């Protein structure tokens, strides 16, 4: 049940509670006034998991209206008094006037009152002085009517229990109201009063249940004056809009109000029974407030019980309910797998989500040549379920209102004519609530979905771990859009596969959903993968945004609470972040700032040349790596050596998310440079690389260094272990560079100055790259090391045309600002620099001249 404290809350008069937890103000021998009977409805012929009440069954039930609509329930306890919940009458700690409220009595349907129904204005509202919020108790209120109610068969007061009254644990009681029939699912027209049977739970049992991890990762301390009712397995409960209504129990032919609907965590969730205000606890306070009213509420003596009420044991253990969904004997043997058979079409794969409903893609049933509704002649349709001796017939097809061939709402629900008896062989998959947060690293697996071919290879190809939200959103989300925080619906869910994909395979004809496991329970997490060409699915539309629709249609789908909660500031970002810009070819240059040292430089490649040397490479596009020519080709060589490229390696270890990728090099492309051997080489890979946190292209910038960028040389500390290290550098202006090297440098050569203590961080034989991070977060490749120098790099910008023409998918960002280095002649070189080429002292002297030269 949605937390009732989220309702519009109003209250007016505050009054103390003398002796709130004391026994009755009357002795057990005192009798109530004879002129007021209570708790005896006239004989007659939602609430989560409930049903329509018969007219006149609950004549004390009232509807409290504010602003023209039903807000809360209440109970008539005397002709001039109504009992309800305090939280209904308070908004942000402010008490609202009683004159803004009205009470409807004798109402069965909010769409059409019964004979005898009438409305009364509210003269005063009284709440306990110590009420502050529902979790702290004292959640009750008394409403004094402006004029007495007209009593009759449809309007009659309920009995109230004395402080000494003891309701037996396990007693079947009834809650009533016009609240939501499920979370975020209002009671439909004609708004008939709902009733549901709930079992009273002892305080120790309730506390044990609420001490277990559950919805929203919250626990609760059950306080004196609180009462619990419901079932460990959930599915029957009060909900939003039922607040203030009565929980009544029959004893000796009378109905006593045991509780006032107060709050809960969700509606009908497992191991989260509803929490009610225990009316008996507040007998003295109620008597004090209504003193002088004639007739007042009736507190009859408790009828003699037929058996004693044993004291509930105080042990901390309790029998918790386990999920009834999502259990499979092994991955791939899914007991919820369903095949919808439509004459003349290939089977459509879906999933059993309740005893009576199957979820499948709506596109299976749409005519590609028509925008009309799917055919409604369902007599010939059949559904095949695991271990079922016969095919199930289809009674109804319900499409999502936004269903189409290629969007996130490509969903339909099929109702079976005969409900399935659930067993280990046939059970539904669990569905996530909207706030569900699938943890990075969760174990996931692809499952067939819709019409399509099966997997191309062993089942291990279907196994994956879930990427973190930042990576997934920035790879496949909208650039510049804020990354959803944990608990907010994500834009996409992204698997990182554990098994390397077979070279040359194509998954274009297969269709998949994404199942993810928590504590041994499988959830249908994602549906309809994003288009990925021949690659395995890279991203899925999250299902949790559709949970309310599925729940509304089925009224019984197994939406299950999150079962794994070990996340927080150390696991995933909890502050709002945005994604760097994309290019026309997609995301590039992404790196998580909090990445551990030595990992997650997703464009950094190891280029193994003919078994005798390893060069640094940079992934420019899914099928291309850039490296320094002098490292990958021997001087004078014209043949392509055997070269293998590795991505996603931090020394000897694979990255924790996204795993080692290897490709062969099938060709080497060099630009045409007159008279000189070009410093840069493009390596064409044998097949494209799946984009992931361990293999993602870097961005390129066509016009020098954007203002504000910070730059680094990225290489390896030792060539044998190849653990990545980054050395901070400043890129010198072209004028200083020309001064230092007397104009002997090839055009487009960059000079760098290492930060103090950074000179020897990287070994240079592998020709490391020069990178810069732009202010908005993107990383760009600026240059590759020149042979024999630690300070010189071949610039990428001048080769923009060649790279774009050769690669096609190179990620050049739009030019921003002006180049970092100004143009200028070497005739202005200070004499000290002109004589200092190669001298370390000259390099440090540059620090003193930086401001002068830049001016």
UniProtKB/Swiss-Prot annotation:
<keyword id="KW-0325">Glycoprotein</keyword>
<feature type="signal peptide">
    <location>
        <begin position="1"/>
        <end position="22"/>
    </location>
</feature>
<keyword id="KW-0645">Protease</keyword>
<feature type="disulfide bond">
    <location>
        <begin position="72"/>
        <end position="88"/>
    </location>
</feature>
<feature type="disulfide bond">
    <location>
        <begin position="739"/>
        <end position="751"/>
    </location>
</feature>
<feature type="glycosylation site" description="N-linked (GlcNAc...) asparagine">
    <location>
        <position position="508"/>
    </location>
</feature>
<feature type="glycosylation site" description="N-linked (GlcNAc...) asparagine">
    <location>
        <position position="421"/>
    </location>
</feature>
<feature type="disulfide bond">
    <location>
        <begin position="239"/>
        <end position="267"/>
    </location>
</feature>
<feature type="disulfide bond">
    <location>
        <begin position="615"/>
        <end position="631"/>
    </location>
</feature>
<feature type="active site" description="Charge relay system">
    <location>
        <position position="87"/>
    </location>
</feature>
<dbReference type="InterPro" id="IPR018114">
    <property type="entry name" value="TRYPSIN_HIS"/>
</dbReference>
<feature type="domain" description="Peptidase S1 3">
    <location>
        <begin position="590"/>
        <end position="808"/>
    </location>
</feature>
<feature type="glycosylation site" description="N-linked (GlcNAc...) asparagine">
    <location>
        <position position="369"/>
    </location>
</feature>
<feature type="glycosylation site" description="N-linked (GlcNAc...) asparagine">
    <location>
        <position position="217"/>
    </location>
</feature>
<feature type="glycosylation site" description="N-linked (GlcNAc...) asparagine">
    <location>
        <position position="130"/>
    </location>
</feature>
<keyword id="KW-1015">Disulfide bond</keyword>
<feature type="active site" description="Charge relay system">
    <location>
        <position position="139"/>
    </location>
</feature>
<feature type="propeptide">
    <location>
        <begin position="23"/>
        <end position="46"/>
    </location>
</feature>
<keyword id="KW-0720">Serine protease</keyword>
<keyword id="KW-0272">Extracellular matrix</keyword>
<feature type="domain" description="Peptidase S1 1">
    <location>
        <begin position="47"/>
        <end position="291"/>
    </location>
</feature>
<keyword id="KW-0964">Secreted</keyword>
<dbReference type="Pfam" id="PF00089">
    <property type="entry name" value="Trypsin"/>
</dbReference>
<dbReference type="GO" id="GO:0004252">
    <property type="term" value="F:serine-type endopeptidase activity"/>
</dbReference>
<comment type="function">
    <text>Serine protease. Hydrolyzes the peptides N-t-Boc-Gln-Ala-Arg-AMC and N-t-Boc-Gln-Gly-Arg-AMC and, to a lesser extent, N-t-Boc-Ala-Phe-Lys-AMC and N-t-Boc-Val-Leu-Lys-AMC. Has a preference for substrates with an Arg instead of a Lys residue in position P1.</text>
</comment>
<feature type="disulfide bond">
    <location>
        <begin position="506"/>
        <end position="534"/>
    </location>
</feature>
<feature type="glycosylation site" description="N-linked (GlcNAc...) asparagine">
    <location>
        <position position="402"/>
    </location>
</feature>
<feature type="domain" description="Peptidase S1 2">
    <location>
        <begin position="323"/>
        <end position="555"/>
    </location>
</feature>
<dbReference type="InterPro" id="IPR033116">
    <property type="entry name" value="TRYPSIN_SER"/>
</dbReference>
<feature type="disulfide bond">
    <location>
        <begin position="444"/>
        <end position="516"/>
    </location>
</feature>
<feature type="active site" description="Charge relay system">
    <location>
        <position position="243"/>
    </location>
</feature>
<keyword id="KW-0732">Signal</keyword>
<dbReference type="InterPro" id="IPR001254">
    <property type="entry name" value="Trypsin_dom"/>
</dbReference>
<feature type="region of interest" description="Disordered">
    <location>
        <begin position="292"/>
        <end position="316"/>
    </location>
</feature>
<dbReference type="GO" id="GO:0005576">
    <property type="term" value="C:extracellular region"/>
</dbReference>
<feature type="glycosylation site" description="N-linked (GlcNAc...) asparagine">
    <location>
        <position position="92"/>
    </location>
</feature>
<feature type="disulfide bond">
    <location>
        <begin position="348"/>
        <end position="364"/>
    </location>
</feature>
<feature type="disulfide bond">
    <location>
        <begin position="206"/>
        <end position="228"/>
    </location>
</feature>
<feature type="disulfide bond">
    <location>
        <begin position="711"/>
        <end position="772"/>
    </location>
</feature>
<feature type="glycosylation site" description="N-linked (GlcNAc...) asparagine">
    <location>
        <position position="407"/>
    </location>
</feature>
<keyword id="KW-0865">Zymogen</keyword>
<keyword id="KW-0378">Hydrolase</keyword>
